[in-house]
Curated annotation (Swiss-Prot):
Disruption phenotype: Deletion mutant shows a considerably lower isoleucine uptake rate as compared to the wild-type strain. The keyword Chaperone does not apply. GO terms for cellular component: plasma membrane. Branched chain amino acid transport system, which transports isoleucine. It comes from Corynebacterium glutamicum (strain ATCC 13032 / DSM 20300 / JCM 1318 / BCRC 11384 / CCUG 27702 / LMG 3730 / NBRC 12168 / NCIMB 10025 / NRRL B-2784 / 534). Belongs to the branched chain amino acid transporter family. GO terms for molecular function: L-isoleucine transmembrane transporter activity; L-leucine transmembrane transporter activity; L-valine transmembrane transporter activity. The chain crosses the membrane at residues 11-31, 41-61, 76-96, 111-131, 140-160, 186-206, 219-239, 268-288, 296-316, 324-344, 358-378, 390-410. Pfam families: Branch_AA_trans. This is Branched-chain amino acid permease BrnQ. InterPro entries: Brnchd-chn_aa_trnsp_Livcs. One of its GO terms (biological process) is isoleucine transport. Keywords: Amino-acid transport, Cell membrane, Membrane, Transmembrane, Transmembrane helix, Transport.
């Protein structure tokens, strides 16, 4: 297992995770949490870093892609879930969002023609960079990610050194339950779904590099990428700790920090950071979705899928960020409970045994609960659940359902063991 290959692939994975949302969430958390920053950021890291890392490991333990994982939930779930996951974080949401966010920050003019031209160039470059799936690790890991990290480090160091703001009183939820608020904020990045998708890219990269222990290398890369994410989040969060005033979001905080410390050059650097973050994520998403659908329908080549997804993303992004969010956010919210359930069941399975009924009970409870959460008219039927107000009402029902399934699996295993012993004695 080459250390160089692992490092380059780790940098690639970091850059694919680190999109626009990952850039702007931590500074706002740093500002809002105030003096309660430490528990808030630790909660944030638990769901925005640890959960995606565990998702990558779950993919490795289950096979080579999310379809191998999802098959444990039955044939229907095994087909529908991965398709929904790849489309929602791909061409119908996260992918066009990379272009829309880049345009709104870099240009910010409400003009359909300008938006169309910008997004055309953006997705043309992303398509070109993802055209050869075997070369993505080098393009992202060797060049784009080091450039992105360098710019982020410069912004963080100058901001912390030059800005003289002090942490204020924690606002809203951060005053009462800072760790819980941070946990929920990290949960809302929904990076666990992206992790399920990116697993196939990491595994393919190591296979192309002829790495012997692909599974081990993938797990190590996931941990290294996670450590990098955590360090960057801590740095960005610290910027929120040294600014004072009212800011609409993390973008405004970072823009202020860049202008205050470096003037107009800082503004240019911030735009470069955001576009690089969005571009590396776009390349990863095009590659991941195209590889998955190529494996699903081998008759349609990777390059055809890549072109189709880039064109769809261009069209959706040109319609604007609000359109992207309105269309895809409900879908993401619907499949996320199932994704997390799938990840944790895949992680505990090697410690126990084949969990047929545990998977079926747990996953389908998550699906049904998410359906009730997605339809406002059905919400009154589930408001009694613990954590419902935090959009986590599905957690306890899924745990109970999984425990029932585990009891059935355990009972069946015991019955099979008895039957086997009796047949041997006869």
């Amino acid at each position: 297992m080459s250390k160089k290959s692992v490092l380059i692939t780790s940098l690639m994975l970091f850059s694919m995770f680190f999109g626009a949302g990952n850039l702007i969430f931590p500074p706002m958390l740093g500002l809002s949490a105030g003096t309660n920053y430490l528990p808030a950021i630790l909660g944030f890291l638990a769901t925005s870093v640890l959960l995606p890392v565990l998702a990558i490991i779950a993919v490795v333990l289950s096979g080579e892609n999310v379809k191998d994982m999802a098959s444990r939930g039955g044939k229907i779930f095994g087909l529908v879930f991965p398709i929904a996951a790849y489309l929602s974080i791909g061409a119908f949401y996260a992918l066009p969002r990379t272009g829309a966010v880049s345009y709104s920050t870099a240009v910010g003019v409400d003009n359909a023609l300008y938006s169309g031209l910008f997004n055309f160039v953006f997705f043309a470059v992303a398509l070109a960079l993802s055209w050869n799936p075997n070369g993505i690790a080098d393009k992202l890991g060797k060049w784009l990610t080091p450039a992105l990290l360098t710019l982020i480090v410069v912004l963080v160091v100058l901001s912390v050194a030059k800005l003289d703001g002090t942490p204020g009183e924690p606002s809203s939820a951060y005053a009462q339950q800072p760790a819980g608020a941070g946990l929920l904020e990290g949960y809302m990045t929904m990076d666990a779904i992206a992790a399920l998708a990116f697993g196939i890219v990491v595994i393919s990269a190591f296979k192309y590099q002829k790495v012997n222990k692909v599974r081990t290398a993938t797990v190590v890369s996931a941990f290294i990428a996670g450590i990098l994410l955590a360090l960057v989040y801590l740095g960005l969060g610290s910027i929120g700790q040294v600014v004072n005033g009212e800011f609409a979001d993390g973008t405004a905080i970072l823009n202020y920090a860049a202008l205050s410390t470096m003037g107009q050059a800082g503004r240019i650097m911030f735009v470069a950071i955001l576009i690089l973050a969005c571009m590396t994520t776009a390349v990863g998403l095009i590659s991941a979705t195209s590889e998955f659908f190529n494996s699903l329908l081998p008759g349609v080549k990777y390059h055809v899928w890549a072109t189709v997804f880039a064109l769809i993303s261009f069209g959706v992004a040109t319609m604007g960020l609000d359109t992207v969010l309105a269309v895809a956010a409900p879908v993401i919210s619907f499949i996320y409970p199932s994704a997390i359930t799938l990840v944790f069941l895949s992680l505990i399975e090697p410690l126990l045994f084949r969990l047929k009924w545990t998977y079926l009970f747990g996953i389908w409870t998550a699906v049904v609960w998410a359906l009730f959460m997605s339809i406002p008219a059905l919400n009154p039927f589930i408001e009694w659940a613990p954590l419902h107000s935090m959009s986590l009402g599905w957690v306890v029902p899924v745990l109970v359902a999984s425990a029932i399934g585990l009891a059935i699996d355990w009972n069946k295993k015991g019955a099979q063991s008895v039957a086997k012993k009796e047949s041997i004695s006869v």
